[in-house]
Amino acid sequence: MANLLQNPDIYGDRILFTCCDELWEYSLSTGEKKRLTSHLGVVNNARYYDNGTKVVFRVMFGQSLDAADLFSIDLKSGELKRLTFITGKSVGRRKFTDVAGFSKDGSIIVSTDAFQPFSVPMLYKLGDDGSLDPLNLGPAVHYIEKNGRIYIGRDTYDLPHWKEYKGGTRGKIWSGTIEKGFKKIIDLENHISCPVIVKDRIYFITDIDGAGNIYSTNLDGNDLKKHTDFHEYYPRHLNTDGKTIVFSMGGDIYTFDPTNDNVKSLDIGPVFDTDLNQSYAPSKFLEDFSMSPGDMYSTVSRGKAFIFNENVNYSIPVKSDGRVRYSRFLSKNEISLVIGDKDGDSIGVFDAGTGEMKRKIGPLGNIFSVKSSADGKYLVVGNDNFQILLIDVSNGTVKEIDQSREGLIVDFAISKDSRFIAYSFPVKSSDLASYVQRHIKLFDMLNDKHYDVTTETANDFAPAFDADTNYLYYLSNRSLDPSTDRFTFNFGYLNITRPFVVPLKKGYVSPARNMPQDIEPEKGEYDLERLKYISEPLPVDQADYRSITPLKDGVLLFSVPIHGEFSSYYSGQPEKGIIVKFEFKDKKVKEIKKEVVDFKISTDGSKIMFSKQDGKLYTFRMEKPEEEKSLNIDAITIVSNVKEDFAEMYDEAWKLARDNYWDKEHALTISEKIYERYRKLVERCVTRWDLSYLITEIQGEYRTSHSYEMGGYFTDIDMPRAGRIACDFKYSNGEYVISDILYGDPSNENEKSPFLLSTLDADIGDAVIEIDGIPIGKGKSIYEALVGKGNRSVLVKIRKKDNSVRSGFVDVLQDDRYIRYRAWVEKNKKFVHERTNGRIGYIHIPDMGIMGLNEFYRQYVTEASRNGLIVDVRFNGGGFVSQLILEKLYMKRLGYDNPRRGTLEPYPMNSIEGPMIAITNEYAGSDGDIFSYSFKALHLGTLIGTRTWGGVVGISPRRKLIDGTVLSQPEYAFWFKGSGFSVENYGVDPDVVIEYPPEMYNVNVDPQLERAIEMVLADLEKYKIELPKK
């Protein structure tokens, strides 16, 4: 079977290509294939250089391929060399440190974002000794020199996950010289990628005709010609030796002759295979777990289920015929699994002693929650059709209990006698209401009747029955008590959750009342009509509770301590909570266990099974919670067949796209064709990166934003990461001379170079000559010397400008991007203040997430007080908080508090008085698009810059592939009054277009910021500011 071949280059009769994460060379004349690399990581984007005697290529490494560096091979000697030591990061769209091209003298030009405050690659000339000399030509991923001119490809990267892209960051080509300036010569309606030059024409890939094909223009960007007519697959990875063009398409390598447009497929044949069976540790891929009514446990990891005992010396693999997502014991002898395939999720019922399937029920949609009744007769599931379904396990009948219009029903409980099902039902007060609220409903299986337990005016969740079905407990976010914002004039509702209890029978009162037995009312039958009138809270403090579990003498409450959102938002780590017990008798709360991510309790309430952030499982008995025991699930080995895994993951990726794309009719129309087109290539996949090639192609067929593949498990290979010291260097006369020591606000934490905190007394112009006793310079670059030094102190020796030598310890960082960002912002702010004599404020918003909100408020409280304001959203990475920021900017000043002592205080506080200008660019996207559009629509001021990214179909990824990969699907299409859906795949046009050409970067001039200052000062001249007399 042929392999999936990618990333070709050509030199004469030799072809480079990547296959199975390795680099290979193929001879056109002899057909010989030769492997050039072995187990470096994931190799791609190789290029011949130095007259075909060497190859430079990129290696991606780390479990999720979150870093990359460049390597080379000498084809004569076989010497392998690591060229860069910067471990440039990747982002969701996988823009890495890469080979951009070659200078006239044959030097490698590197594109990387490693030294930038944003994930936008810039160009550097790589020296033989590892030095990196910035070209200062702005964002670019391709670089070509021809006839004394430089051709720069901005954003001309491969874009398989968004075909027919037309937004602001579509690929463009600039041409010119630093001395005479640059001109944008190719700017089509659609994206262009992989530009190369052969003789007097520029060739590239674009899909302006609806399918990816090779086009060309002359060297001035005119005379557009189409050369191929492909329809099934897109060509990718265009390269040339100046005569013949080579590319990959549909997993094969092709040559293209520019003289006659002849396309030839190369019959390279099978290249490589690998062991089809791979072994994995369950804790790395833990998805779900449960306990049996006896002494057995189950876990789901990497799509497979296992049953095991507490010592994990006995385990049974459950023999499912699909991808397992959840496991629930029905009894000591039976277990149920949620099993998925391309048609949806089904319930499989298995013998718990043998792991053999007994029957299968479904498909039932895509299931997001499942619970079993205590007697094992019923299962309740919630699916993506917003249904809650009741399943009779014995006969497989399925009954719809309820269906919401507004959201998933995934929060439910079954009474121990299997009569009642309580569930949290999503509802909105009207079709145009902003919030989805939830209230508790009760379904009586005996009488086939529904009851409202709570009203629809709050957010009620986590229903739970006591063992005797006398009470129904739930949590509610209705105890409003605002907390003061310590930074701005604001309040937030943080601790508003309390547990409530509802007696289900006449004569019952809250067990927390502890009424004397001689005055307790007579107990009666179920009284379900008046449930919503008799809820009462338990006497515990409000907190951020997530679940409640009734016990005989109290309840367990699981809460997450109030914390800042910043770290968890960006790290993706699950939150850690605390289990406490509230005892009815003494009304005291006792802490049971900390550091809990998720937990399950045994049916008799005596034992708890829980997980921590390390992915491992633990148990403890309620009477001795301090004596926890680790369940060594890694004693179980998961053995997977690679081909079967990839087929399953492909099916799931395709299914998620089909079932979640916002336009259901469109998805159903195109999905089957997409499936067949790429499914036949799955059998050619050998490595996870091969499969990624196909997944991104599937995503791209929907031709919509926010189709990403994130995370996952691509390789076990990692390399030491680069350390950072938040300094820039100029390589001069064999020495690394400090050209900048970076800092933002020097009084803030994490905003300054560690050089400023050392005893070195380093300054600009000093040279670093040693790190940890190793000379730095011609023999070793400073970047290589800092590899593996992150979060460590190193001994640095510098030569001062007066030739004196000093040594001192410097605390090396793992990442200095935030310091670079804050330095960039403070530099811009200082420039604005100086140019306007302090009259105009400056705010930059890096994204519309937690960091963006932080940065906005950090600056807003001081900058909004000036006579005008520049709001900079260039490079804004999107998020969800734009409306919170717009709310502040929209607030106009109405007056002042005029005190006897002190100065005036504006009303409303921090309101804007004066004109505003917003700057945007092609790297402002998603909620950055929405902000840019809204700034114009609300007439807050003039929007200047360049057209934005153009991606406003939102995502809410809820499922992972078996290796932890998160796939996003465009689910929520954004519609604007007056413009409809037009911002998607186009972007927002500024009122005034201001380009940022390459030569402006070279002279360190920001034409967009310059123009913003000019315009806001002109607007200020027309603005009348009124003040009271003091």
Curated annotation (Swiss-Prot):
SMART domains: TSPc. Its EC number is 3.4.21.-. The active site is at H706, S926, E984. Keywords: Cytoplasm, Hydrolase, Protease, Serine protease. Residues 286-635 are annotated as: Seven-bladed beta propeller. Residues 1-270 are annotated as: Six-bladed beta propeller. Residues 817-1022 are annotated as: C-2. Residues 93-94 are annotated as: Binds the substrate's C-terminus. Substrate binds at G877, G878, G879, G954, I955, S956. It is found in: Cytoplasm. Residues 641-712 are annotated as: C-1. This is Tricorn protease. It comes from Thermoplasma volcanium (strain ATCC 51530 / DSM 4299 / JCM 9571 / NBRC 15438 / GSS1). The lineage of its organism: Archaea, Methanobacteriati, Thermoplasmatota, Thermoplasmata, Thermoplasmatales.
